[in-house]
């Protein structure tokens, strides 16, 4: 005896549903027990048939056709055929032969043990199981009773013989098993499978009741005192078709409780049968109505929930007096949710194993993410890791996705539709830019750790890919080379912007947290490449003064293209000499400390040592009563800077302020050891003797190799 053969999953669950075998699909095998080795041996004993064999499944389907024939002919013979025609008798015997073959075949068909769920192919166990269960019923439903009775009594049309023929209705259990498998078959619609089953049960009940009621009338001594004889006195001489249709008519009117009254019981036997039939109809009607109601309610439940949510949202908006535009956004959200509920992308993906989710995400999102400018040139591994974090979402028209001055938000890529980039100028909203398919938004605020500079609102029904800012940063940190390419793409994108519209209530955190250039956003978004921040307000080259107002202090910015030269000392900051330069007056409040920031940005021409794409930013920080210190940082457009040319900005950390508020920075070349760094700090800051260095995030640094070009280092005395 071999048990086991761990055989498939799919057909065990579907109870024997046949699926085409292939290396890329589920095979007809059973699930092994936990910890068992899968499929060591799938070969059954000799002459043993697998219940999942395609040929055996075809044989079962052929028998289903014969079962349907037997279910119809048995009640019909009992009621309408007193003498069985020889041709019909031959057909009956042929059908019985097929079922007799199936009885023999069953002794060689393996079965699944109900306790172990393993396939049993031992002949003795198969025989014992069959003999102790359905063998007797199968034999009785297949035995040729008419030839046996003719052999002993020579009366083949006896009523007892015909009643014994009803044992063939036992074969209907095969139809029940068939419908059970079809209901779980993904190739067939569940609704129509259930409807077919209910219709089949109803038709069979109508057929049997009509045949039995006619048999009672046909064998009643007084034909005129029967339900059919009362309206058709010579009904026995009528055609078989007329009598059969009349019987079905009575049966269906009684089943549906219509009861026209033209056909009714005339004798006690018929009355008794009608009572039993109508009692049966109560249960059958409850079964049919219950199942149909369940199917219909299940199909309309989504619509009912949608209408309830719309009504609740409308009442909520009216009760709280929400503006009309917000109310429309809420209603549009529910409408779109109803339309896309059937998709259930994320719910479905969460139910799948990680390997399948990876394949689906790679197939759907990889081409879209690859086309985004931010990821242009990054490695395929970076994209492959990123697609796993992408979620596809739908947004209705005019829905705000990101709000201006909102905290850090996620990054979005437009798959379809369009998104308007909106800015508020003097209280009025203006469309600054329109994001089309394949473009992205939200990346500036997320990557630069700043509030969102714009409001992003859908212009039409849009499908967006949302990338979590947290996961994006983690992936960037894990892929240092790709992060350089990515940030360079962001820099190039920002340099393409020629101007920035005036904004009300600018958030000063934008200036303090923006670590990419360490200059205000107005500087890197202006068309001109050189700015000057000094004490007094002047004008730009066009005699225009862009105003960025809205907080308690006014800010006026002027830009002018100038050329200047600067000399660089190895361990000192570059100092730019200003001659006849326009001036910008800036007042701001950072962390409750009001200081004046003077920013000067110089760009070299094509004859300079560096290319025109290299921008020199000189940031002067101080107050009117302090000596200004100059900080110069050059930001190249190349992907990286050679290790030998690492330059960092050192700050004297004051214990009564935060790290981000440390002032008086010095730009130096990074030495080879911390001791040299402390020595340079002592030279640059007189009377200061540092013994410890921390990063901008207050992380202690104990090895110069972890310091990157352009880092800001804060020296502490311990």
UniProtKB/Swiss-Prot annotation:
Parts of the chain in the membrane but not crossing it: 246-265
Cytoplasmic side: 1-60, 110-132, 184-197, 291-718
SUPFAM superfamilies: cAMP-binding domain-like, Voltage-gated potassium channels
A cellular-component GO term for this protein: monoatomic ion channel complex
Extracellular side: 82-88, 154-162, 219-245, 266-269
GO molecular function: voltage-gated potassium channel activity
Pfam family, one: Ion_trans
Transmembrane segments: 61-81, 89-109, 133-153, 163-183, 198-218, 270-290
Residues annotated for a nucleoside 3',5'-cyclic phosphate binding in this entry: 374-493
Disordered as annotated region, ranges: 560-584
Biased composition (Basic and acidic residues): 575-584
Protein name, as recorded: Potassium channel KAT1
Gene source species: Oryza sativa subsp. japonica (Rice)
């Amino acid at each position: 005896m071999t048990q086991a053969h761990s055989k498939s999953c799919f057909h065990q669950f579907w109870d024997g549903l046949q699926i085409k075998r292939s290396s890329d699909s589920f095979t007809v095998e059973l699930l092994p027990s936990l910890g068992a080795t899968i499929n060591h041996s799938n070969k059954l004993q000799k002459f043993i048939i697998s219940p999942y064999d395609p040929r055996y499944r075809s044989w079962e389907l052929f028998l289903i056709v014969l079962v349907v024939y037997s279910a119809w002919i048995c009640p019909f013979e009992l009621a309408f055929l007193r003498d069985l025609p020889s041709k019909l008798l031959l057909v009956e015997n042929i059908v019985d032969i097929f079922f007799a073959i199936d009885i023999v075949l069953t002794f060689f068909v393996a079965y699944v043990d109900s306790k172990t769920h393993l396939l049993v192919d031992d002949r003795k166990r198969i025989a014992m199981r069959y003999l102790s269960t359905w063998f007797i019923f199968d034999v009785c439903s297949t035995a040729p009773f008419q030839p046996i009775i003719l052999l002993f009594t020579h009366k083949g049309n006896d009523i007892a013989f015909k009643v014994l023929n009803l044992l063939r209705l036992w074969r209907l259990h095969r139809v029940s098993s068939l419908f059970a498998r079809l209901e779980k078959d993904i190739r067939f619609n569940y609704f129509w499978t259930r409807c077919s089953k209910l219709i089949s049960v109803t038709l069979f009940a109508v057929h049997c009741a009509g045949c039995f009621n006619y048999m009672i009338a046909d064998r009643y001594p007084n034909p005129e005192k029967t339900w059919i004889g009362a309206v058709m006195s010579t009904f026995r001489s009528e055609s078989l078709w007329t009598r059969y249709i009349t019987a079905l008519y009575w049966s269906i009117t009684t089943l549906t409780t219509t009861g026209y009254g033209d056909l009714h019981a005339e004798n006690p036997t018929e009355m008794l049968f009608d009572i039993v039939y109508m009692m049966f109809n109560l249960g059958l009607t409850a079964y049919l109505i219950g199942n149909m109601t369940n199917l219909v309610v299940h199909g309309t439940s989504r619509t009912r929930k949608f209408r309830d949510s719309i009504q609740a949202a409308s009442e909520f908006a009216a009760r709280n007096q929400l503006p009309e535009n917000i109310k429309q956004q809420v209603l549009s959200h529910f409408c779109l949710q109803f339309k896309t509920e059937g998709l259930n992308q994320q719910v479905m993906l969460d139910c799948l194993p990680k390997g399948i989710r990876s394949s689906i995400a790679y197939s759907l999102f990889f081409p879209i993410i690859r086309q985004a400018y931010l990821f242009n040139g990054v490695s395929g591994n970076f994209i492959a890791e990123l697609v796993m974090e992408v979620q596809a979402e739908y947004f209705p028209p005019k829905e705000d996705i990101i709000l201006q001055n909102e905290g850090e938000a996620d990054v979005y890529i437009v798959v379809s539709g369009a998104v308007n980039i909106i800015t508020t100028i003097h209280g009025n909203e203006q469309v600054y830019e329109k994001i089309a398919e394949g473009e992205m938004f939200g990346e500036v605020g997320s990557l630069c750790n700043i509030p969102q500079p714009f409001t992003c609102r859908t212009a039409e029904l849009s499908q967006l890919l949302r990338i979590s800012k947290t996961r994006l940063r983690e992936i960037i940190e894990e892929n240092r080379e790709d992060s350089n390419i990515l940030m360079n793409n962001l820099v190039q994108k920002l340099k393409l912007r020629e101007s920035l519209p005036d904004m009300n209530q600018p958030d000063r955190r934008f200036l303090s947290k923006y670590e990419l250039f360490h200059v205000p956003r107005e500087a890197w978004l202006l068309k001109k490449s050189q700015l000057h921040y000094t004490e007094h307000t002047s004008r730009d080259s066009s005699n225009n003064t862009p105003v960025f107002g809205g907080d308690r202090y006014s800010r006026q910015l002027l830009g002018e293209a100038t050329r200047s030269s600067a000399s660089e000392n190895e361990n000192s900051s570059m100092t730019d000499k200003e001659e006849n330069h326009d001036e910008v007056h800036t007042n701001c409040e950072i962390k409750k400390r009001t200081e004046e920031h003077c920013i000067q940005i110089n760009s070299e021409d094509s004859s300079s040592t560096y290319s025109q794409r290299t921008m020199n930013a000189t940031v002067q920080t101080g107050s009117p009563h302090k000596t200004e210190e100059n900080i110069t940082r050059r930001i190249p457009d190349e992907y990286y800077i050679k290790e030998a040319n690492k330059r960092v900005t050192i700050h004297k950390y004051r214990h009564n302020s935060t790290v981000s508020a440390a002032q008086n920075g010095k730009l130096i070349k990074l030495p080879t050891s911390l001791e040299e760094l402390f020595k340079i700090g002592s030279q640059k800051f007189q009377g200061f003797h540092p013994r410890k260095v921390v990063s901008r995030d207050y992380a202690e640094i104990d090895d110069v190799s972890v310091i990157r070009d352009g880092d800001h280092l804060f020296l502490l005395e311990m």
